[in-house]
Amino acid sequence: MRFYHRDELIDVIRSADLYVHPAEFEIEAIACLEAISCGRTPLIADAPRSATRFFALTDRNLFRANDPRDLAEKMDWWLEHPDEREACAQRYAGYARQFDFDRCMDEMERMLTDTTGAKRHVP
């Protein structure tokens, strides 16, 4: 096991057919966001203490936490249906755009200026 630089990590993610997110505890879901931004269809554990489960667009993107059989069945389905997997990846790519850093910062600035009544700085 090793750490990857960002460019290396993107290459690793893009080389995968699916992205599996088995975390039982997570708040930010950054790894999942990176994977879907790279065009990977995610399989996400439905762990009750993981916010990432809320990124599942369909039931096929969720598997029962700590249930390797359910995970294997979901993986097999996605691997046996490449057209559906690609369509799902495209939906996720569009979905991930709302979490783009620059877009989020623009929204945060808009929220703060609306709340304070200040004028928005437009470069």
Could you describe each region identified by the protein language model?
Residues E80-T113:
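A charged, aromatic-enriched C-terminal amphipathic alpha-helix characteristic of glycosyltransferases
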Residues I10, E28, L33-S37, A51-R53:
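Short alpha-helical segment that forms part of, or immediately flanks, the ligand-binding pocket
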Residues D17, G39:
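A short alpha->beta transition loop at the rim of the catalytic pocket in nucleotide-sugar-dependent
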Residues Y4, D11-A16:
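Short alpha-helical donor nucleotide-sugar binding micro-motif in glycosyltransferases
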Residues T41-D46:
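Short hydrophobic beta-strand element within catalytic cores of glycosyltransferases
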Residues E24:
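Aromatic "clamp/platform" in nucleotide-sugar-dependent glycosyltransferases that forms part
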Residues L57-P68, W77-P82:
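Conserved acidic donor-binding segment of nucleotide-sugar-dependent glycosyltransferases
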